[in-house]
Every structure is written in structure tokens, then in C-alpha cells.
């Protein structure tokens, strides 16, 4: 636990430095864009004088327009996550919103929960009715998939973008088929880049469901076609999902939707510390927001 606290502290300092660096780079980027605009504009004038009928003039004008569009400041701040949306409008309701993690230009449509635990939560995973197959390959987990947002996996690339821009906490809400509910919260949640095989950093548990996720701390992501676990076999194949498997799991939120008690071992939507390895939960939702 002491090692985890040290890691959380160092991670917090790293993110602060990265955000400061990012802000500095953004400022440099605008100045650089202005210089590019000036140079390209000068080139347009020169080309118009020496090559009045040339296609170069039109091409350079197009370049100037592109640079100007890329460097124009936005009229309104763009939300990075659901917490920003809630902060900008305290009356926001749960639903789909567009966010811009890592300053991606085209935006990302996400499901926001504005009701649970003071709201501002961004849903990264959801199981509710078994309508979607989660036994998928690496690329699908990398970029995400959903079924009209009834069930979804946001995508590992987006998880990395989101959790690299600030310190995030994770909340996992779950229910069984007998109508009982439990939750687990983690004060630290981060997903590494694809170069790290989306390495998981998680810790600081509290809640009522028991801590089934901390044993996955430091694990790499595995799917049925990419084996990064610590077992001799393939955990993703054996337990029918994609996750940060170790040897193999104590949490399997992306397993088969088996509707309660099942005879097979640990291949359902399992949370070991609550209902064990032979009970598949009715619902489970993983959500994040910045600390």
C-alpha cells in the first residue's frame, strides 16, 4: 500500500507537469500557426505576382485557410469530460454528450451519468441486458463498441486520452438478479498508451462490493487474439472477455452474460468479492471523473 501511495503521488506530479507542458505547447502552437499563416500569405502574394495563372496560387490560398482554421481560438471552452459539462451547466441531465479528451478536434460522444454520487461521471463500460457480445478482438477493444449505449466499452485509446489529462477516480456500480446493489470506488485509475499495451493503474479502494479490481493493478490488456496476461494459457479465451487479466482474474466485467448462478467457472460477469466466481451479475457500470 505504501508503494501505491508513492506511485499515486509521483503520478499526480507527472500529470501536473504534463498539463503545464501541454499548456505551454498550446501557446507555442498558436504562435507557430500565426507564423505559418504569415509565411503562407506572403507566398500567395509572391506566387500571384510571378505565376498569376498557376495552380500554385489556389493551392497556397487553400493552405492559408486551413492554417487559419486550425489556429483560431474557440468561442467557448470545450469540455474534456462529463465533469466539465456538469461544471459548465449544473442542471445537466444524464445522457449523451460530446467531449474532447486530449484536445481531439472531432470530439467523442460519451454517456454521462449526472445523478449518481454528485454526477459528472463518464461511463466507460456498461452491461445491462446481454444484448452485446463482449468476446471481441484487440482492435474492437482498442477503439470501442456499443449497442445504442445499452451496453458499451468506450475504447482503450480513449481511456488513455481521458486519464492522461488529469487524475481520475473510478466508480463501479453493480446489481444482482435478486435486486441487491453494491459499488466499488478507486481513488486512482489510469490507462497507459498502446505502447504499454494499455497498462492499468488502479488503487485506493472503498465501497460495499469488496475489492476485486486492485489485484489487476499493473496488468496489460488482453483479448482473445492478443495474450498479455501472466498465465500459462490465455485468460481472455478461457473467461470469454477482454480485460486486464493477470493469472487470471478477480473481476470479469466483460465476461459472458450468464444471468445469475452458472455452473461454468469464472466466465460470467463476475465480481469475486461480492457474488463469487459462479454468479454472473445483472448489471455492472464502470464510470470515471477527475479528482
Regions flagged by a language model, labelled:
Residues 265-291:
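C-terminal helix/juxtamembrane-tail motif
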Residues 145, 224-226, 274-277:
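Conserved, non-catalytic sequence blocks in retroelement Pol enzymes and Pol-derived host proteins
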Residues 2-118, 179:
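Assembly "stalks" and propeptides
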Residues 74-217:
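Extracellular beta-rich globular recognition domains, centered on the fibrinogen C-terminal
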Residues 184, 194-257:
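Surface-exposed interaction patches
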Residues 143-147, 151-153, 248, 253-259:
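Short secondary-structure subsegments characteristic of cysteine-rich extracellular domains
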Residues 220, 261-265:
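Mature hydrolase/peptidase catalytic cores and their serpin-fold inhibitory cores, especially
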Amino acid at each position: 500500500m505504501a508503494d501505491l501511495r508513492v506511485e499515486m503521488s509521483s503520478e499526480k506530479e507527472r500529470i501536473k507537469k504534463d498539463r503545464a507542458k501541454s499548456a505551454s505547447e498550446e501557446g507555442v502552437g498558436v504562435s507557430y500557426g500565426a507564423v505559418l499563416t504569415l509565411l503562407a500569405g506572403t507566398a500567395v502574394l509572391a506566387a500571384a505576382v510571378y505565376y498569376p495563372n498557376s495552380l500554385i496560387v489556389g493551392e497556397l490560398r487553400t493552405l492559408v485557410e486551413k492554417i487559419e482554421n486550425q489556429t483560431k481560438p474557440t468561442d467557448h471552452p470545450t469540455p474534456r469530460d462529463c465533469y466539465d459539462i456538469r461544471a459548465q451547466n449544473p442542471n445537466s441531465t444524464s445522457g449523451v454528450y460530446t467531449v474532447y479528451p486530449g484536445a481531439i478536434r472531432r470530439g467523442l460522444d460519451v454517456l454521462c451519468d449526472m445523478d449518481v454520487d454528485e454526477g459528472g461521471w463518464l461511463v466507460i463500460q456498461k452491461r445491462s441486458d446481454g444484448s452485446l457480445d463482449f468476446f471481441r478482438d484487440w482492435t474492437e477493444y482498442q477503439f470501442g463498441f456499443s449497442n445504442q449505449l445499452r451496453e458499451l466499452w468506450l475504447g482503450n485509446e480513449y481511456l488513455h486520452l481521458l486519464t492522461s489529462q488529469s487524475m481520475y477516480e473510478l466508480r463501479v456500480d453493480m446489481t444482482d438478479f435478486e435486486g441487491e446493489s453494491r459499488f466499488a470506488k478507486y481513488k486512482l485509475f489510469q490507462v497507459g498508451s498502446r505502447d504499454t499495451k494499455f497498462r492499468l493503474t488502479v488503487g485506493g479502494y472503498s465501497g460495499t462490493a469488496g475489492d476485486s479490481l486492485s489485484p489487476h493493478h499493473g496488468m496489460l490488456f488482453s483479448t482473445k487474439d492478443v495474450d498479455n496476461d501472466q498465465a500459462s494459457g490465455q485468460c481472455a479465451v478461457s473467461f470469454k472477455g477482454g480485460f486486464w487479466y493477470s493469472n487470471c482474474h478477480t473481476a470479469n466485467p466483460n465476461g459472458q452474460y450468464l444471468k445469475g448462478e452458472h455452473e461454468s467457472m469464472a466466465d460470467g460477469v463476475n465480481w469475486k468479492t461480492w457474488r463469487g466466481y459462479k454468479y454472473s451479475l445483472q448489471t455492472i457500470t464502470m464510470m470515471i471523473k477527475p479528482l
